[in-house]
Amino acid sequence: MDSQVRQNYHRDCEAAVNRMINMELFASYSYTSMAFYFSRDDVALPGFAHFFKENSDEEREHADKLLTFQNSRGGRIFLQDIKKPERDEWGSGLDALQSSLQLEKNVNQALLDLHKIASDHTDPHMCDFLETHYLNEQVESIKKLGDFITNLSRMDAVKNKMAEYLFDKHTMGGKN
């Protein structure tokens, strides 16, 4: 049955929103993997665990917003399989942050592509929705991750585990 509320909502936009929902859920799934890796007894970096758990929750909220948007525009939700994260072992905090940065850049590019599709189909509602709820937040997340990576690299945290521990405790808010 067709939606009664659908107006100026192109099928390409609808399909792209469904793909974006999947990408946000994949990001949440990846961050969940990172969070529980860092809370293992042999890794024990609670600040990193907390940071990645918060990121997982945030990505899930992004997916929920897109699901709500899809319904409000009269689109249909077609969930897809969520891909497994690229790995199960995340290495050091620096390694995980570098993976996180790449993930956020991929999400950002997908959002920019989604915005272009909306713009090409003259959908000001979708453009406004993406600009209001996603685009600036992505840039801020990428900047924050870049700053964390710079500081951990500056402290030579790969070789200096005390630096990683202190970064976890003081920057990431880890508590024993």
From Swiss-Prot:
User: What is one term from the GO cellular component aspect held by the record?
Assistant: cytoplasm
Spell out the family assignment given in the record's similarity comment: Belongs to the ferritin family.
Q: Which residues bind Fe cation 1?
A: E24, E59, H62
- Name of the protein in question: Ferritin, liver middle subunit
A GO BP entry: iron ion transport
* UniProt EC number: 1.16.3.1
Functional note: Stores iron in a soluble, non-toxic, readily available form. Important for iron homeostasis. Has ferroxidase activity. Iron is taken up in the ferrous form and deposited as ferric hydroxides after oxidation.
Give a GO molecular function annotation for the protein: ferrous iron binding
The enzyme class is oxidoreductase
Q: Does the keyword Protein biosynthesis apply?
A: no
The tissues where this chain's protein is expressed are given as:
Liver (at protein level).
Q: Tell me where on the tree of life, at the top rank, the source sits.
A: Eukaryota
**Listed CDD domains:** Euk_Ferritin
| Pfam families on file | Ferritin
- Complex and partners: In liver, forms a heteromer consisting of middle and heavy subunits. The functional molecule forms a roughly spherical shell with a diameter of 12 nm and contains a central cavity into which the insoluble mineral iron core is deposited.
Q: Which positions are annotated as binding Fe cation 2?
A: E59, E104, Q138
Q: What positions does the domain Ferritin-like diiron occupy? A: 7-156
Give the catalysed reaction(s), semicolon-separated. Answer: 4 Fe(2+) + O2 + 4 H(+) = 4 Fe(3+) + 2 H2O
Keywords attached to this Swiss-Prot or TrEMBL record, sorted alphabetically, are:
Iron, Iron storage, Metal-binding, Oxidoreductase
Lineage summary: Eukaryota, Metazoa, Chordata, Craniata, Vertebrata
